[in-house]
Amino acid sequence: MSNELSKNMVEQYIAIVLTDIIGSTRFVQKNGSHIAAQWFGIHDKAVMNFIARHNGQLIDASDGHLMMFATVSDAIGFAFDYKKYIRKRKFPFRSRVGIHWDKMLIVKSEAHMVRAGGKRINLEGIGKNIAARTMSICGEEQILLSKSAYFQYKKYGHRSRFIPNKAQSALVGLYRFKGVAEPEAIYAIGLIEAQLQPPPDGEKAKRIGGAKKIRSRARDRKFWEWIWWFIWRGGFVSFLMILYIIWPAMFDPN
């Protein structure tokens, strides 16, 4: 085998996005195939619309979707729109989203394979595994990023009008992924503190380090949070002052 790329192959950096409907099998069993097919159809149509809006390309689909974007900013913009749509339309299910940035081999399928029902494009590379593992531990209201995707976001994310200005991000932990040699730092991006909490282990992802709980940073605190912050600390300081005053009297024999 030659190391040279074939004419139908190209290697480039892309944002790989994987989504997955949480509990899809249980949903079908509970509601029946007819109702499930209607919901999944509405869901898939929305996903395709958001992929087009953010200049992405669908690679594969089943219970979830595999897609690629030219930039991480486009991928995150897609994720925010997608998650918002699921919430606002009150879908009876939620989904996971994982985003990874990597150099991938993009393979264009031959015409006869496409005519037979095959995919037009395939992605090859370990990056697809990392994206899948990242997605697998995502909470139902979360958007998770790999380390490389997070760095791309921090570098270029401010340029995107589709990423909310109030978006917050946090390192949620270090995970060891099955089939991936090096541990992966995973980040969450969201609008509220609850969306930035560390996800638990998954079948193919084990958490090996990181904070147990993510707390809001000073610049992200809301007004009522600042009030509570000052009351709590003011009360603690007052307690120390009172203790300082009465401590000598407690041990004064007179």
Language model: regions and residue ranges:
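Short, acidic Gly/Pro/Ser/Thr-rich loop/turn segments
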Residues: 24, 104-106, 194-196
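Intrinsically disordered, glycine/charged-rich C-terminal tails and inter-domain linkers
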Residues: 1-12, 140-141, 147-253
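Catalytic beta-strand-to-alpha-helix segment of the class III nucleotidyl cyclase homology domain
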Residues: 66-191
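Juxtamembrane/interface motifs at transmembrane-helix termini
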Residues: 46, 56, 96-98, 204-206
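Catalytic NTP-binding/metal-coordinating core of nucleotidyl cyclase/transferase enzymes
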Residues: 2-81, 85
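Polar/charged alpha-helical tracts
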Residues: 53, 115-117, 225, 229
